[in-house]
Amino acid sequence: GVYTFGPRAEEAKIETDKAFQRRFMQDNDIPGCPVFETFDDMDAACEFIDDYDGDLAVKPVGLTGGKGVKVIGDQVTAAEAKEYIRESEYEQVVLEERLIGEEFTIQAFVADGDLRTAPAVQDHKRAYEGDEGPNTGGMGSYSDTGSQLPFMQDGDYEAAVDIMEQTVAAMPDYKGVLYGQFMLTTEGPKVVEFNARFGDPEAMNTLPILETPFLDVLTAARNGDDLPELDFSGEATVCKYAVPDGYPTDPDAGTRIEVNEETVGDGLLFYASVDAREDGLHTTTSRSFAVVGRADSISAAEKIAESALAAAGEGFHIRHDIGKPDLVQSRIDHMTELRGE
């Protein structure tokens, strides 16, 4: 047979079942778990919203492609959240405290209790510049020259890795990629969710700068050997997605994609959801392609990505602000304000 580097269905529940994920953290005393309750009675869930002193995140238990979560006080009102719960016909929902801070992701290779982590990445879920608009599968992301991001302090990255290590210790049979999405709060990192796979777009930030041969990691996992330590190039990266006009609410599918691959320059080009026809590639209703810039600073990497986007042609929406100095600085300022510094 063909060796597969990935968790079994039982371990993958850490992604596919959000109620399991929270109970697993609670039962194993894993730090970073927000206050939560699970409900299969939607009327009871709505009553909990009425009685709760503060804002909540509403999370359907199953997979929603990164677009099922609604946050009271950010995306919806309490009344809108209750309407969403009643009309969506989910079998079960998790209601948990709204986490305030800056999100980041750490991806890791896991096998036989070993965990090898990549640099932190920040994704941008909102569709429009300035973090406005509906949630998407991710409009782009960036990483810095080291393991942590500019808004993080010493120890924040290590605290998040410790949460992942304790998670793996409580799930010793887990093999594959473990994706930890965190909210950096004034109390340290809190777990937004775990995924049993690479992040999209975050994998496009980390894999191009991975200098340890990817095959060596898989071979070690297959053979039961210790996973090799991971070496990265030390470059900053910026990834930006080109999506169909109207994405995600009313995407314009069927537009011909005319990417001039010769003008991508130093950027990397990754096709995503495209429809291959006799006359070329066409958009679907999902994200079309991404470009990645790598350089010795976030700002320089952003310029490479932006230059590569000149190859995109017409009919696409792009968040040009991702990785630009003003947006990166706004993340730093946000955490500084929350910390009261």
Protein language model regions, located:
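Conserved anion/nucleotide-ligand pocket segment
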Residues: 53-74
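Active-site "cap" helix and flanking loop/linker of ATP-utilizing ligase/carboxylase catalytic domains
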Residues: 159-169, 174-178, 195-264, 276
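A short, GP-enriched loop/loop-strand-helix hinge that lies immediately N-terminal to
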Residues: 1-17, 29-39
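A cross-kingdom feature marking charged/low-complexity
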Residues: 322-341
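Internal nucleotide-binding/catalytic subdomain
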Residues: 68-198
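Short, well-ordered beta-strand elements within core beta-sheets of diverse protein domains
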Residues: 287-295
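Short amphipathic alpha-helices in soluble, non-transmembrane regions
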Residues: 254-256, 302-309
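Short arginine-rich
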Residues: 90-91, 307-323
